[in-house]
């Protein structure tokens, strides 16, 4: 049994690497074509809420002007001097107690009037 074997001849292959300078890409962005007839149109059944005394948005914060220097938010009402039986002055013997300036006299100070969102709406007269 004779077996003929052929010797594998090495094949020659070449890899050639070509380096090119990378040019910066330019991306041009264009907006969509403007539609000349892009006005909003309403049908007859749409209700106009203007001038109907309806609130149009939710308000998260209501601005109250800052108190004058030296005033605190605890000194709110006229006539409260905290000298009644509900006073907690005897509860904590060594605690610092704030001095109360308000001795039942309103010195021309009054609470700010509520703004439009704090006021209850008046019923309409028909």
UniProtKB/Swiss-Prot annotation:
Entry GO MF terms: protein phosphatase 1 binding; protein phosphatase activator activity; protein serine/threonine phosphatase inhibitor activity
Keywords: Nucleus
InterPro entries: PPI_Ypi1 (IPR011107)
Biased composition (Acidic residues): 71-91
Residue ranges of the region described as Disordered: 1-126
Basic residues bias (residue ranges): 96-107
Compositionally biased residues, Polar residues: 1-16
Principal subcellular localization: nucleus
A single Gene Ontology CC term: nucleus
Function, in words: Regulator of type 1 phosphatases which maintains protein phosphatase activity under strict control.
Protein name as annotated: Type 1 phosphatases regulator YPI1
Organism annotation: Yarrowia lipolytica (strain CLIB 122 / E 150) (Yeast)
Lineage, broadest ranks: Eukaryota, Fungi, Dikarya, Ascomycota, Saccharomycotina
Name of the encoding gene: YPI1
